[in-house]
């Protein structure tokens, strides 16, 4: 049996830009992608801490070191600049993988700077 497990999470990312007219996606600072082991075009689930909205889109690379978290296209309707997001990826795993697996959690602070990286 396969289970869909949390693979990686950017916790409390601050939205820096929302552009309704841009092709859909979520731009994420490349440093944050590396820290969370997330990849461009990977599907992500986003949870808005401010308003409870839950939605999905895919990643595009943002400028390295910029702290960018940009919501584009339809996703821009789900959050405002300054809102806090939890950004997650999931992966199917079998029972053997689940038994020893730990997701990577990147805790973010002001300016989307990395505060800590945990493998819970």
UniProtKB/Swiss-Prot annotation:
GO biological process, one term: alanine biosynthetic process
Pathways involved: Cofactor biosynthesis; (R)-pantothenate biosynthesis; beta-alanine from L-aspartate: step 1/1
Annotated cofactor note: Binds 1 pyruvoyl group covalently per subunit.
A Pfam family annotated for this UniProt entry: Asp_decarbox
PTM comment, free text: Is synthesized initially as an inactive proenzyme, which is activated by self-cleavage at a specific serine bond to produce a beta-subunit with a hydroxyl group at its C-terminus and an alpha-subunit with a pyruvoyl group at its N-terminus.
Necessary cofactors: pyruvate
Entry's Gene Ontology cellular component terms: cytosol
Keyword Cytoplasm on entry: yes
CDD domains: Asp_decarbox
UniProt-listed InterPro entries: Asp_de-COase-like_dom_sf, Asp_decarbox
Keyword Lyase: yes
Modified positions (Pyruvic acid (Ser)) in chain numbering: 25
Keywords: Autocatalytic cleavage, Cytoplasm, Decarboxylase, Lyase, Pantothenate biosynthesis, Pyruvate, Schiff base, Zymogen
Localization, UniProt: Cytoplasm
Residue positions binding substrate: 57, 73-75
EC number of the protein: 4.1.1.11
List of catalytic residues: 25 (schiff-base intermediate with substrate), 58 (proton donor)
Gene3D superfamilies, sorted: 2.40.40.20
One example GO MF annotation: aspartate 1-decarboxylase activity
Annotated catalysed reactions: L-aspartate + H(+) = beta-alanine + CO2
Enzyme class, first EC level, given as a word: lyase
Function: Catalyzes the pyruvoyl-dependent decarboxylation of aspartate to produce beta-alanine.
UniProt xrefs under PANTHER family: ASPARTATE 1-DECARBOXYLASE
Assembly, per entry: Heterooctamer of four alpha and four beta subunits.
Protein family: Belongs to the PanD family.
Protein name (Swiss-Prot/TrEMBL): Aspartate 1-decarboxylase
Lineage: Bacteria, Pseudomonadati, Pseudomonadota, Betaproteobacteria, Burkholderiales
């Amino acid at each position: 049996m396969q289970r869909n497990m949390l693979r990686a999470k950017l916790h409390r990312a601050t939205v820096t830009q929302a552009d309704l007219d841009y092709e859909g996606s979520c731009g994420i600072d490349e440093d944050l992608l590396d820290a969370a082991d997330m990849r461009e075009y990977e599907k992500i689930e986003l949870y808005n801490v401010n308003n409870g909205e839950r939605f999905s889109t895919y990643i595009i690379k943002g400028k390295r070191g910029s702290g960018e978290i940009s919501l584009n296209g339809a996703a821009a309707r789900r959050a405002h600049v300054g809102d806090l997001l939890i950004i997650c990826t999931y992966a199917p795993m079998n029972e053997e993988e689940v038994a020893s697996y730990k997701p990577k959690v990147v805790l973010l602070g002001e300016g989307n700077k990395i505060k800590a990286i945990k493998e819970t």
